[in-house]
Amino acid sequence: MRNACTRARLTRTARAMVKTLFIAIASVTFFFTSDLALPQSAAAYPFWAQQTYPETPREPTGRIVCANCHLAAKPTEVEVPQSVLPDTVFKAVVKIPYDTSVQQVGADGSKVGLNVGAVLMLPEGFKIAPEDRIPEELKEEIGDVYFQPYGEDKDNIVIVGPLPGEQYQEIVFPVLSPNPANDKNIHFGKYSVHVGGNRGRGQVYPTGEKSNNNLYSAAATGTISKIAKQEGEDGSVKYLVDIKTESGEVVSDTIPAGPELIVSEGQAVKAGDALTNNPNVGGFGQLDAEIVLQDANRVGWLIAFVALVMLAQVMLVLKKKQVEKVQAAEMNF
């Protein structure tokens, strides 16, 4: 009898252990495969800046890190109100102008349209307004833009893109101002706003490698002995440019599809000479602006002061006219 009970207990224990083990395996499997089936937002564009510079996209020098990969300088504009009241929704407009008739080199070497993107660094406490706080008119201006915070605790740093440049040369950000009455760390005063705008692909990857949207130059001095075209199994195309030096050594430069070769076999080149054109038509630009978080009470007192000054001026004018009338009456008398 005891043996039967013992065997029953062991059987139940074994079943429980197997069930627990099965659940653990299923949980681990789901954990590792969920990132593949449902990619996290951090892996979406622009993950380069977020992964390489997780704390802030702005260097101590003031330079926004996007400029490390997008080497060409292009203009960027921003429009923000001069001052805003607490707990109000306003719009910040980032303008990224460029010639829409030009096309850039795609990753496969083909010609494609330019994409645009922007980063808006707001003061602490400012953030993208919730959906229910955005007026309908402003929603129409925003369109289908998705605003991505730079990090979990960085709601004041917002990233947008890539977006089709032909439709979004102006990106409208709906911003909610903080209320110092609810947050003691927020104070009234003047704050800085930092903006970066980009159009087109970068010339350098964060790893330091060149993209195919860049100029390629000779690695050695000599004569170009051979230019060969190679096609990969995936259909990718690249060119091998062999340079024979005076010592007889052959140095090979690999050029991906995209840049156009401007050299030919038998041509003498020096180290650093361009082998291709520069296909880049895009670029990055940044600028700073200022915004004042205004106290409504101060505005009220300012209006009252202005009204008092105007009233005093009116009284002075009336008094002056009264004196003139008295003087005129005395002269007539």
Swiss-Prot record:
Output the Gene Ontology cellular-component terms: plasma membrane-derived thylakoid membrane
* Signal sequence annotation: 1-44
| Co-factor remark | Binds 1 heme group covalently.
Q: Which UniProt keywords apply?
A: Electron transport, Heme, Iron, Membrane, Metal-binding, Photosynthesis, Signal, Thylakoid, Transmembrane, Transmembrane helix, Transport
Required cofactor(s): heme
Among Gene3D superfamilies, the record links this protein to: 2.40.50.100, Cytochrome f large domain, Single helix bin
Keyword Thylakoid (UniProt): yes
Q: What residues does heme bind to? A: 45, 66, 69-70
What InterPro entries does the record point to?
Answer: Cyt-f_TM, Cyt_f, Cyt_f_lg_dom, Cyt_f_lg_dom_sf, Rudment_hybrid_motif
Q: Which GO terms describe its biological process?
A: photosynthesis
Q: Where in the cell is it found?
A: Cellular thylakoid membrane
User: What does the record say about its membrane topology?
Assistant: Single-pass membrane protein
TM region(s), chain numbering: 299-318
Q: Name one GO molecular function term.
A: heme binding
Q: Per the similarity annotation, which family is this?
A: Belongs to the cytochrome f family.
What is the purpose of this protein?
Component of the cytochrome b6-f complex, which mediates electron transfer between photosystem II (PSII) and photosystem I (PSI), cyclic electron flow around PSI, and state transitions.
What does the subunit comment say?
The 4 large subunits of the cytochrome b6-f complex are cytochrome b6, subunit IV (17 kDa polypeptide, PetD), cytochrome f and the Rieske protein, while the 4 small subunits are PetG, PetL, PetM and PetN. The complex functions as a dimer.
The family database entries (HAMAP family) matched by this protein are listed as: Cytb6_f_cytF (MF_00610)
Q: What is this protein called?
A: Cytochrome f
Q: Which gene encodes it?
A: petA
